[in-house]
Regions:
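Bacterial Sec-dependent N-terminal signal peptides
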Residues: 1-23, 100-106, 110-114
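Right-handed parallel beta-helix/beta-solenoid
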Residues: 18-43
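Structural detector of coil-to-beta-strand junctions
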Residues: 27, 68, 130, 159-161, ...
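Right-handed parallel beta-helix/beta-spiral solenoid domain characteristic of secreted/periplasmic
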Residues: 30-37, 52, 57, 76-157
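Short, T/G/N/S-enriched strand-turn elements that build extracellular solenoid repeat scaffolds
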Residues: 39-50, 66-74, 80, 184-185
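Short glycine/acidic-rich loop motifs that flank beta-strands on beta-rich extracellular proteins
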Residues: 53, 65-70, 89, 149-155, ...
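Feature marks extracellular polysaccharide-active and adherence modules
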Residues: 61, 72, 81-83, 134, ...
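Residue-level detector of conserved catalytic or cofactor/ligand-binding positions
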Residues: 186-194
Length: 194
């Protein structure tokens, strides 16, 4: 009888622990140290089901996320929630500087190494921003969005940290850092005839 009672208690405890693990409000957790569901923000976004009609919450744990993040048009309602805006940082070193012409002002050509137009650059053919939001109903809080090029160089070509092309995008308690054109809003919605 004692073994039966112990078995029932053990099964009940396991069921409670399992229920608590499932009670997280987040559909995904990103942690650069590997303690979450994903190590990069883009991996978590890629896993979001297409055509969401309600918020898909992604917790991003404190850390430095050196990557470009693109939320595609077919992934609306993505919510990126960081732990602390000073410790949850999505950053990358890129700019949209054109090919060198030999007539650069003051001979400044260092930007070309990190230009999205340079075939030798690690960011060649990237979209021209650290984060590009195309999915509507985007929400984010407690995250810093940083274009390292703009912060480190304090001069040069356009170096976007955020490019929001989404309808109904909200930003709460976030930081945006770069040198030129840090945050770009470019919304084009064409209504179809009814």
């Amino acid at each position: 009888m004692k073994n039966i009672v112990l078995s029932i208690l053990l099964m009940s405890a396991c069921a409670m622990i399992y229920a608590q693990a499932d009670s997280s409000p987040y559909q995904a957790i990103v942690a650069v140290d590997g303690s979450g569901d994903y190590k990069t923000v883009q991996e978590a976004i890629n896993a979001v089901p297409d055509g969401q009609t309600k918020p898909w919450l992604i917790l991003i744990k404190n850390g430095l996320y050196n990557e470009q993040v693109i939320i595609p048009k077919n992934k609306p309602y993505v919510h990126l929630i960081g732990q602390d805006k000073d410790k949850t940082i999505i950053h990358l070193n890129l700019n949209v500087g054109s090919k060198l012409t030999g007539k650069e002002i003051g001979g400044k050509t260092a930007y070309w190494e990190h230009s999205v137009h340079n075939p030798s650059s690690p960011v060649y053919k990237y979209e021209g921003s650290v984060v590009v939001v195309k999915g509507d109903h985007f929400y984010t809080e407690n995250i810093s969005y940083v274009n390292d090029w703009g912060v480190l160089s304090d001069n040069g070509p356009q170096a976007l940290a955020m490019n929001s092309q989404a309808d109904c995008a909200s930003f709460y308690n976030c930081k945006f850092r770069s040198f030129q054109d840090t945050w770009m809003l470019s919304l084009i919605h064409i209504s179809e005839p009814t």
